């Protein structure tokens, strides 16, 4: 579904990949390939798919220490959601902030 001509299928694919990591399962062995694909295509994608790709990169950065800096750099390089206003108590979508906040939350547990 990652290469589907349908936006909804692409968005679903990326959301599912992020969700696999978010729910605490052992990350699949496709993380390197996913991250490379995100880096290569996120800026050309539809906004709905960009969000889901960003979501996946965020959770990779939170849970996979070896990819954390790479995910943060991706956020800095693309600037996606950097200027997005976020309500108090909500986590921003901007990758550097998202990863820092979500990672720190899990360190307190």
Which role fits each region the language model picked out?
Residues 1-109:
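Alpha-helical scaffold domains
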């Amino acid at each position: 579904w990652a290469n589907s001509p349908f936006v909804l299928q692409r968005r679903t694919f990326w959301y599912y990949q992020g969700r696999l990591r978010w729910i605490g399962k052992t990350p699949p062995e496709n993380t390197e390939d996913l991250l490379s694909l995100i880096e290569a295509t996120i800026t050309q994608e539809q906004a709905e798919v960009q969000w889901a790709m960003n979501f996946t990169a965020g959770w990779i950065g939170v849970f996979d220490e070896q990819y954390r800096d790479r995910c943060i750099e991706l956020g800095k390089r693309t600037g996606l959601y950097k200027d997005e206003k976020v309500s108090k108590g909500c986590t921003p979508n901007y990758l550097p902030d998202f990863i820092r906040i979500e990672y720190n939350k899990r360190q307190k547990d």
